């Protein structure tokens, strides 16, 4: 082991540490970070070399953050990344600094949004917040409006998590939806992601995603937002149902094919009455 450590360069050590951090399960960033810190045993090297991994983790996980003085949380995503550690809160029209290690937002300041698409963004956000409130007990959403390749584009992100460390499981739902504002009809593109980690008496992870495409009729802002939410709701309901049914099927068929739940005799052994069994008598006479 000592020879292996001598062979690894600092660059290689940091690369391995960063990989562990980026793939930390939902709600377990601190635990993974602390373990990696002990293994690396060099705080300066970890901070300088793996800082990009801290940022990538928060961007990938749609990490929600509360900004002091503002009611609603905002998601940390690539769509709100303004560079130099600053992020956009489109609802409140502010930008703020974000510490990727501490997961804290500071220094909120006014920020002018894309005026040309703001009315569309606001309509979609209003409809999406109502939907998230109805379907996600701990849900947070952020809606962006921006020009991409000259086209006015709406990007809607949803995050919801349950961290139950005392019960040995954590999970997170993420979904991202995007469409351009074009006359008559447009294409909606979405991706849905679920990640769950269960680690009591074992280590089981569910990592699943699904890509969605659908067409959306574009009329006025309010009606378009309503039609967009119908697409989101139908797709996310179908995905959740499919995941649940798939695991029920696995429980009923696949797992049973791997291992018998009961012995060949189809009866469970009553260990309290083991001495009444023939094998128990033989054991007693032995």
UniProtKB/Swiss-Prot annotation:
Keyword Acetylation carried by entry: yes
InterPro entries reported for this sequence: CapZ_alpha, CapZ_alpha/beta, CapZ_alpha/beta_2, CapZ_alpha_1, F-actin_cap_asu_CS
GO molecular function: actin filament binding
Superkingdom: Eukaryota
Entry keyword set: Acetylation, Actin capping, Actin-binding, Phosphoprotein
Entry-annotated residues carrying Phosphoserine: 9
Listed Pfam families: F-actin_cap_A
Signal peptide boundaries: none
Entries under PANTHER family matching the protein: F-ACTIN-CAPPING PROTEIN SUBUNIT ALPHA, F-ACTIN-CAPPING PROTEIN SUBUNIT ALPHA-2
Family: Belongs to the F-actin-capping protein alpha subunit family.
Biological function: F-actin-capping proteins bind in a Ca(2+)-independent manner to the fast growing ends of actin filaments (barbed end) thereby blocking the exchange of subunits at these ends. Unlike other capping proteins (such as gelsolin and severin), these proteins do not sever actin filaments.
Protein name, per record: F-actin-capping protein subunit alpha-2
Organism: Felis catus
């Amino acid at each position: 082991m000592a020879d292996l450590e001598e062979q690894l360069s600092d660059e290689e050590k940091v690369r391995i540490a960063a990989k562990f951090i980026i793939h930390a399960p939902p709600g377990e960033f601190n635990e993974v970070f602390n373990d990696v810190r002990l293994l690396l045993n060099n705080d300066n090297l970890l901070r300088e070399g793996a800082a990009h991994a801290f940022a990538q983790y928060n961007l990938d996980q749609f990490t929600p953050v509360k900004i002091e003085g503002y009611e609603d949380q905002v998601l940390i995503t690539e769509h709100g990344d303004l560079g130099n550690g600053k992020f956009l809160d489109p609802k409140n029209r502010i930008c703020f600094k974000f510490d990727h290690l501490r997961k804290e937002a500071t220094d909120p300041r006014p920020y002018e949004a894309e005026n040309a698409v703001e009315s569309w963004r606001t309509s979609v956000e209003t409809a999406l917040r109502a939907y998230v409130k109805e379907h996600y007990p701990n849900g947070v959403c952020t809606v962006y409006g921006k020009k991409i390749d000259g086209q006015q584009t709406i990007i809607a992100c949803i995050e919801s998590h349950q961290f139950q460390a005392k019960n040995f499981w954590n999970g997170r739902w993420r979904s991202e939806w995007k469409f351009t504002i074009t006359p008559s009809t447009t294409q909606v593109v979405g991706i849905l992601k679920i990640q769950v980690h269960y680690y009591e008496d074992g280590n089981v992870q569910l990592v699943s995603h699904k890509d969605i495409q659908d067409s959306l009729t574009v009329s006025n802002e309010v009606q378009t937002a309503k039609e967009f939410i119908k697409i989101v709701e139908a797709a996310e309901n179908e995905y959740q149902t499919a995941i649940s049914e798939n695991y029920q099927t696995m429980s009923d068929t696949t797992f049973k094919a791997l291992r018998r739940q009961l012995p060949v005799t189809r009866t469970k052994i009553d260990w309290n009455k083991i001495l009444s069994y023939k094998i128990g008598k033989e054991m007693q006479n032995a």
